[in-house]
């Protein structure tokens, strides 16, 4: 397969995900297919965003790492110290992705590391490993292109997260501001009663304890639910199950 064909295969994957978040496991699988390598896509804090492993699955340590979804802190730090592409790293180098304890199995292995950059900052690392055969110039071009694409996707996800947080905060603020004084007081007592972000509420019990009518509680919950801040489900005589849908709601409630 030519370099152009391999590049197009990566582009095809991205076009399939246009407008939605890319699954980095799919990206890792595609990179593995076109480069014939073991692949790790790692965040700057060592979280495994995506991987596609073949020979490396023979190592129990690698299997444990995949279960934890994190690479060791020491290796993360070593990767972050790599400022530009480093290719054809052998098994005796501390940057090798292959487990040194299996040195005899991976004696001819080669590791290549591509820093993932975007928006003027380091976002993570693309690590490719081959059991044998050096990485050639075409491999390096493809790897650097893949790292650039991954960086763009990570930035897009970050941007989407910031936008979602802003929308959630606006919805929470509007919902809290729509409450009357007594309704806000009722909500504060409800979550004090629940002791967390979800639980079973008996409205009459809270109403009697606080000295407000049950209708105030019902109206307050209805306003929050219509704003998408909470969800509630009646369980009949048992009460009402309540769950917070917006993570920052309780923090914002305390501030108001």
From Swiss-Prot:
Residues 203-222 bind DNA. GO terms for biological process: negative regulation of DNA-templated transcription. InterPro entries: CodY (IPR014154), GAF-like_dom_sf (IPR029016), GTP_trans_reg_CodY_C (IPR013198), Transc_reg_CodY_N (IPR010312), WH-like_DNA-bd_sf (IPR036388), WH_DNA-bd_sf (IPR036390). It holds the Pfam family CodY. Residues 1-155 are annotated as: GAF domain. One of its GO terms (cellular component) is cytoplasm. DNA-binding global transcriptional regulator which is involved in the adaptive response to starvation and acts by directly or indirectly controlling the expression of numerous genes in response to nutrient availability. During rapid exponential growth, CodY is highly active and represses genes whose products allow adaptation to nutrient depletion. This is Global transcriptional regulator CodY. It comes from Staphylococcus epidermidis (strain ATCC 35984 / DSM 28319 / BCRC 17069 / CCUG 31568 / BM 3577 / RP62A). The lineage of its organism: Bacteria, Bacillati, Bacillota, Bacilli, Bacillales.
């Amino acid at each position: 397969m030519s370099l152009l064909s391999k590049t197009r295969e990566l582009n095809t994957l991205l076009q399939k995900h246009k407008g939605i978040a890319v699954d980095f496991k799919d990206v890792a699988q595609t990179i593995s297919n076109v480069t014939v390598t073991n692949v790790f896509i790692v965040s700057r804090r060592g979280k495994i965003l995506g991987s596609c492993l073949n020979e490396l699955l023979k190592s129990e340590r690698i299997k444990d790492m995949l279960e934890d979804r994190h690479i060791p802190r020491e290796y993360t730090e070593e990767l972050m110290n790599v400022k530009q592409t480093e290719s054809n790293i052998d098994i005796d180098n501390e940057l090798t992705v292959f487990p040194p304890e299996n040195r005899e199995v991976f004696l001819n292995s080669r590791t290549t590391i591509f820093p993932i950059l975007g928006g003027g900052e380091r976002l993570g690392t693309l690590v490719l490993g081959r059991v044998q055969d050096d990485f050639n110039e075409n491999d390096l071009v493809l790897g650097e292109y893949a790292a650039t694409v991954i960086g763009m996707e990570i930035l897009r996800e970050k941007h989407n997260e910031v936008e979602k947080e802003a929308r959630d905060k606006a919805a929470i603020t509007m919902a809290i501001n729509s409450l009357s004084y007594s309704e806000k007081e009722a909500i504060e007592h409800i979550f004090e009663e629940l002791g967390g972000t979800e639980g079973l509420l008996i409205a009459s019990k809270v109403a009697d304890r606080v000295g407000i009518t049950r209708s105030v509680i019902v109206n307050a919950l209805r306003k929050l639910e219509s704003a998408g801040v909470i969800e509630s489900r009646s369980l009949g005589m048992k009460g009402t199950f309540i769950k917070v849908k917006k993570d920052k709601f309780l923090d914002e409630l305390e501030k108001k």
